[in-house]
């Protein structure tokens, strides 16, 4: 009657409420006695990019940052499947059964590439390297992509990532990358959707 717009959102009320309740009831489980760790969470329809629910933080009154959409953090080892392995597989350079080196390796500055307290072991399959999130196989995979001239930047930009430098040796382990939970969820949406990226949306 007033000629206004009707805005429809993708948020599923039941899902969104369940996510808020989970944080309210179990958020304390991430406490480590050094302060109150924050949480951010996004649930997305992998086939469309529609956001079905999200958690912006544990307590908006005490911390008014939206940790799902605004706060950027290093994605650390969750970078490996997206920036290293998926691109190598797409390029036909390896498959899940490919054997990769996990022998002790140093960065160019001489510092060893560590995995917890381990400097490396031996050869292992890509599947095992990914399952246990070993660092050295990811390092060598990314180095191979660079040496073969694969345009990693193009892959990442097509998934909405904004990464300023690609010559960082620790990049596949999250070094030099800051991203929101929503954006990183969108990256994984691409993998779950057979490599087809759909930009996230709520309206």
Language-model region placement:
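Active-site SXXK
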Residues: 19, 49, 73-100, 129, ...
């Amino acid at each position: 009657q007033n000629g206004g717009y009707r805005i429809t959102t993708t948020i599923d009320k039941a899902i969104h409420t369940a996510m808020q309740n989970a944080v309210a009831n179990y958020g304390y489980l991430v406490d480590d006695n050094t302060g109150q760790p924050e949480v951010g969470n996004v649930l997305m329809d992998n086939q469309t990019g529609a956001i079905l629910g999200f958690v912006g933080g544990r307590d908006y009154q005490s911390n008014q940052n939206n940790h799902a959409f605004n706060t950027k953090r290093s994605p650390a080892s969750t970078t490996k499947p997206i920036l290293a392995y998926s691109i190598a597989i797409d390029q036909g350079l390896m498959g899940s059964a490919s054997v990769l080196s996990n022998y002790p390796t140093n960065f160019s500055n001489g510092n060893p590439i560590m995995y917890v307290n381990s400097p490396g072991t031996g050869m292992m399959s890509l599947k095992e390297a990914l399952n246990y999130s070993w660092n050295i196989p990811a390092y060598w995979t990314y180095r191979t992509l660079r040496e073969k001239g694969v345009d990693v930047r193009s892959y990442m930009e097509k998934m909405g990532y904004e990464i300023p430098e690609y010559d960082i040796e620790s990049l596949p382990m999250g070094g030099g990358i800051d991203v929101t939970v929503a954006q990183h969820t969108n990256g994984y949406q691409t993998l779950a959707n057979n490599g087809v990226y759909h930009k996230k949306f709520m309206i």
